[in-house]
């Protein structure tokens, strides 16, 4: 089983993750996009990345926004898997939004 991080550990990790918020049992971030087409591209890219890491976020999708929520259900909170995926998502979305 994966170890749940303490609140202090999560907050320390989030110092290195711009825009991510700690919300008790999960972390979240909202990404702004240029338009609907870019929004869907971001969602599909996150889905592929998550599938490759076998760790699946909750996504909220609207016209020019994607909100990502990460938690590890089996641990009942945030784990290193969530932090790793958050970092990967940040890198991926940053690259997509450059174009």
Curated annotation (Swiss-Prot):
Q: List the disulfide bonds.
A: none
Picking any one GO biological process from the record gives:
tetrahydrobiopterin biosynthetic process
Enzyme Commission number(s) from the entry: 4.2.1.96
- Which keywords belong to this entry? Lyase
MF terms from GO for this chain are: 4-alpha-hydroxytetrahydrobiopterin dehydratase activity
Task: Give the catalytic activity.
Answer: (4aS,6R)-4a-hydroxy-L-erythro-5,6,7,8-tetrahydrobiopterin = (6R)-L-erythro-6,7-dihydrobiopterin + H2O
Q: Which Pfam families match?
A: Pterin_4a
Record's CDD domains? PCD_DCoH
User: What InterPro entries would the database entry show?
Assistant: PCD_sf (IPR036428), Pterin_deHydtase (IPR001533)
Q: What sections of the protein cross the membrane?
A: none
Indicate the family of this protein: Belongs to the pterin-4-alpha-carbinolamine dehydratase family.
Protein name as it appears in the record: Putative pterin-4-alpha-carbinolamine dehydratase
Originating organism? Aquifex aeolicus (strain VF5)
């Amino acid at each position: 089983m994966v170890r749940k991080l303490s609140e202090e550990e999560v907050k320390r990790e989030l110092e290195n993750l711009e825009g991510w918020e700690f919300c008790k049992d999960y972390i979240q971030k909202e990404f702004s996009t240029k338009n609907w087409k870019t929004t869907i591209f971001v969602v599909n890219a996150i889905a592929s990345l998550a599938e490759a890491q076998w760790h699946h976020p909750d996504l909220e999708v609207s016209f020019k926004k994607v909100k990502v929520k990460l938690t590890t259900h089996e641990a009942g909170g945030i784990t290193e898997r969530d932090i790793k995926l958050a970092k990967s998502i940040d890198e991926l979305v940053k690259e997509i939004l450059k174009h």
